[in-house]
């Protein structure tokens, strides 16, 4: 459903954000 879709999107954004914090460009 839409809830799981939003959860996946937030998870993906969190992963990317974390990666950006660890290895800033």
UniProtKB/Swiss-Prot annotation:
One annotated Gene Ontology cellular component of this protein: extracellular region
Tissue-wise expression: Expressed by the skin glands.
Keyword NADP: no
Residues that span the membrane, as ranges: none
Family stated for the protein in its record: Belongs to the gastrin/cholecystokinin family. Magainin subfamily.
Function of the molecule: Antimicrobial peptide.
Protein name from the UniProt record: Xenoposin precursor fragment BM1
Source species: Xenopus boumbaensis (Mawa clawed frog)
Lineage: Eukaryota, Metazoa, Chordata, Craniata, Vertebrata
């Amino acid at each position: 459903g839409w809830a799981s879709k939003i959860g996946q999107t937030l998870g993906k954004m969190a992963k990317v954000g974390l990666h950006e914090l660890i290895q800033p460009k």
